[in-house]
């Protein structure tokens, strides 16, 4: 098989002309090439999420969770969105590699207090938080996104930006009612991808959207793009 990082480099060449890859001649996609990136691989994905080596943007993901910030998973994979949610829930509950569920719960309670919302149990707070986040496996239910996911990722990002702006507006209204002077929420969103084509298309599509910052994690290093 070909690693996801190598696939990002070669995907525009596959099926056009034969080329050599690690001693093999690649002429096109294998039959059902993305089977483990779709629902067939859901169970394995949950296992892999607990054992995989963290990527260059992992610390940003940990920071978002620990702060109780809304996040989105936009991926070329086609797993069921609930599978991705379950995998992240497991990471939180197990305090995986820097994730701190107690700090998350503390910050979630802080937000609820600011919004004059009633308190809930720790597990209910985490469940509600997981439901607030967005999960976009753009190949879910279709084969269209696995090989060329960039435009589908753009559509997902448009939806997520709109959602986050709406959440920020609602939070601002609640703080205004509470007479809190710090009621002007301006969301900031970071998007990272190890496929430069995805980063290029995302940056171009949102060049006039100041809330979005794009980063490349190609080659195992996170850089502003």
Residue ranges with predicted function:
Residues 172-175, 180-225:
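Acidic, Mg2+-coordinating phosphoryl-transfer loop and its flanking beta/alpha structural elements
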Residues 54-66, 150-185:
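Short, basic/hydrophobic alpha-helical segments
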Residues 145, 149, 187-188:
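Extracellular C-type lectin-like domains
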Residues 77-79, 152, 194:
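Short beta->alpha linker loops
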Residues 74, 160, 215-217:
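Conserved beta-strand termini and adjacent loop/short-helix elements that scaffold enzyme active sites
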Residues 1-147:
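Alpha-helical substrate-recognition element adjacent to the catalytic core
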Residues 118-136, 155-163, 184-188, 196-200:
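Conserved GTP-binding G-domain of TRAFAC-class P-loop NTPases and closely related GTPase folds
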């Amino acid at each position: 098989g070909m690693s996801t990082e190598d696939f990002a480099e070669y995907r525009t060449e596959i099926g056009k002309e034969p080329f050599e890859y690690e001693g093999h001649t690649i002429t096109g996609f294998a039959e059902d090439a993305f089977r483990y990136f779709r629902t067939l691989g859901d169970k394995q994905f949950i296992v892999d999420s607990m054992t995989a080596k963290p990527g260059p943007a992992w610390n940003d993901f940990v920071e978002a969770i620990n702060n109780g910030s809304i996040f989105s998973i936009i991926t070329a994979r086609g797993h069921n969105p609930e599978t991705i949610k379950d995998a992240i829930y497991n990471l939180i509950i197990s305090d995986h590699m820097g994730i701190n569920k107690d700090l998350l719960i503390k910050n979630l309670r802080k937000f609820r207090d600011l919004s004059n919302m009633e308190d809930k149990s720790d597990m209910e707070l985490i469940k509600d938080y997981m439901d607030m986040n967005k999960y976009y496996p753009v190949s879910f239910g279709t084969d269209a996104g696995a090989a060329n996911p960039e435009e589908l990722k753009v559509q997902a990002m448009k939806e997520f930006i709109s959602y986050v702006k709406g959440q920020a507006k609602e939070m601002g209204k609640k703080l205004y009612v509470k007479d809190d002077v710090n009621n002007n929420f301006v969301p900031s969103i970071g998007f990272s991808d190890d496929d430069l084509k995805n980063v290029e298309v995302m940056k171009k599509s949102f060049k006039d959207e100041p809330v979005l910052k794009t980063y490349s994690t190609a080659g195992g290093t996170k850089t502003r793009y």
